[in-house]
């Protein structure tokens, strides 16, 4: 790995690329395939640190997962809902909050078995009480530091009971943990969210044969009934729109650019960035639309747009673009007028405090950003100069700073740049390809 990257501003972007497989779907394909009966074949898997942490933990639980090669399909032999083994060692989730939170739900109902989950220094400071609390309502026996809010987390598998759970925030990780626990709970489990969050878990569980339904027009009430078995499937994972977003914004703000991003997942619970790009007046089109395994996909063609408009992000759209806030903060710096991000306090509990980190790092380029408790106010029409900036070990910050460097005058230096490997191992190669 190269932890310092130099980027010269002024290069336009031209060409077509295929971004890595969707991170959210990669995690879920592994987990659901592991508790299905029979074989599940996975193609398009994201070969990066976080999903590989999930694979490693599942192997320790007795799942037969082969050595995963980049860009190669592989097959899992599922254990069924009752086949999870008590591990002989601690389950290390690395830096992956998705791994830890979804496994909490998966393991809470494995009766009579003991599990310990831990992670790296960053993950062990992230809040787990939001998952622990609803699982405890179902009968889960879970403990950890700070009254079960911080890892290491200890789980003693217990008999769970279905119930109705209202979540205070719209979180796909919390919802998914409850639904996975619901597979082993007696009766019916219902999750009601304040806003709809990404629904990859629901789609995949349905494809595997789970008795799951969505109630209400807004998709905020998900109901799962226990009983029955999951059956192994063939899963084709589309490109990750969160990874594509860096090129979508780069092509919009870097002069004389045109980029085609092929086979991107267009799940409507993930496409909030397209709504914001519409508000900005970005020049893009979606081509080759289709549906694979219940997930809509398409290719996104983006050209440079002039006189981009400022925007406001708030309310129910946040869960649909929560991972895109760092790169949209960069975009806001080049819009006419003042943009504002509200209701985004959840970003303070990601790999870093992304609100604070993006304000701090972009200001080094000359951005005018005011940090608020729940968001940011960004003055547009910035003139970026070169700077030495730092990802602060956050993968999405690293890639956002790389795009910001393209529109800065001079050569910028990004420290700890290869944090990007967490979700996009080929990011720097793709950047070189598009700027050559």
From Swiss-Prot:
Sequence positions that bind 3-phosphoshikimate: 23-24, 28, 171, 173, 323, 350
GO biological process, any: chorismate biosynthetic process
CDD domains: EPSP_synthase
Keyword Cytoplasm attached: yes
Biochemical pathway: Metabolic intermediate biosynthesis; chorismate biosynthesis; chorismate from D-erythrose 4-phosphate and phosphoenolpyruvate: step 6/7
GO MF, any single term: 3-phosphoshikimate 1-carboxyvinyltransferase activity
Active site per database record: 323
UniProt keywords, alphabetically: Amino-acid biosynthesis, Aromatic amino acid biosynthesis, Cytoplasm, Transferase
EC numbers, comma separated: 2.5.1.19
Subcellular locations according to the entry: Cytoplasm
Summary of the function given for this chain in its UniProt record: Catalyzes the transfer of the enolpyruvyl moiety of phosphoenolpyruvate (PEP) to the 5-hydroxyl of shikimate-3-phosphate (S3P) to produce enolpyruvyl shikimate-3-phosphate and inorganic phosphate.
Record text on subunit structure and interactions: Monomer.
NCBIfam families assigned to the protein according to its UniProt record, in alphabetical order: aroA
Protein name: 3-phosphoshikimate 1-carboxyvinyltransferase
Organism: Prochlorococcus marinus (strain MIT 9312)
Gene name of the record: aroA
């Amino acid at each position: 790995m190269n932890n310092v990257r130099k980027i010269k501003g002024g290069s336009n972007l031209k060409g077509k690329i295929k971004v890595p497989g969707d991170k959210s779907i990669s995690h879920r394909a592994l987990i659901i395939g592991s508790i299905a009966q029979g074989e599940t074949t996975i193609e398009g898997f994201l070969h990066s640190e976080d999903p590989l942490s999930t694979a490693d933990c599942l192997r320790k639980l007795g799942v037969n997962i082969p050595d995963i090669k980049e860009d190669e399909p592989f097959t899992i032999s599922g254990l069924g809902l009752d086949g999870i083994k008590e591990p002989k060692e601690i389950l290390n989730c690395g830096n992956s909050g998705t791994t830890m939170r979804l496994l909490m739900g998966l393991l809470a109902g494995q009766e009579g078995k003991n599990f310990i989950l831990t992670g790296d220094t960053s993950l062990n400071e992230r809040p787990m009480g939001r998952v622990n609390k609803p699982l405890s309502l179902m009968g889960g026996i879970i403990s950890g530091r700070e009254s079960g809010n911080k890892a290491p987390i200890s789980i003693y598998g217990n008999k769970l009971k279905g119930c109705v759970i209202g979540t205070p925030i719209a979180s796909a990780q919390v919802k998914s943990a409850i639904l996975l626990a619901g597979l082993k709970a007696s009766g019916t489990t219902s999750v009601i969210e304040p806003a709809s969050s990404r629904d990859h878990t629901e789609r995949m569980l349905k494809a595997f044969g789970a008795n799951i339904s969505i109630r209400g027009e807004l998709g905020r009430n998900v109901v799962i009934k226990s009983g029955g078995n999951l059956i192994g499937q063939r899963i084709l994972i589309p490109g990750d729109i969160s990874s594509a977003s860096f090129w979508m914004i780069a092509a919009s703000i870097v002069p004389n650019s045109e980029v085609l991003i092929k086979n991107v997942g267009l799940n409507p619970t993930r496409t909030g960035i397209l709504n914001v790009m519409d508000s900005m007046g970005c020049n893009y089109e979606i081509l080759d639309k289709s549906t694979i395994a219940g997930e809509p996909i398409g290719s996104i063609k983006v050209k440079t747009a002039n006189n981009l408009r400022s925007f406001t992000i708030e309310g129910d759209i946040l869960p649909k673009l929560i991972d895109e806030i760092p790169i949209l903060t960069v975009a806001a710096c080049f819009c006419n007028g003042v943009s504002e991000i509200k209701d985004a306090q959840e970003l303070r509990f990601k790999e870093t405090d992304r609100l604070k980190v993006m304000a701090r790092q972009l200001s080094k380029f000359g951005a005018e950003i005011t940090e608020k408790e729940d968001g940011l106010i960004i003055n547009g029409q910035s003139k970026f100069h070169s700077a030495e900036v730092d990802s602060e070990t956050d993968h999405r910050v690293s890639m956002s700073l790389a795009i910001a460097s393209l529109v800065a005058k001079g050569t910028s230096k990004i420290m700890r740049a290869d944090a990007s490997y967490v979700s996009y191992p080929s990011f720097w190669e793709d950047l070189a390809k598009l700027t050559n």
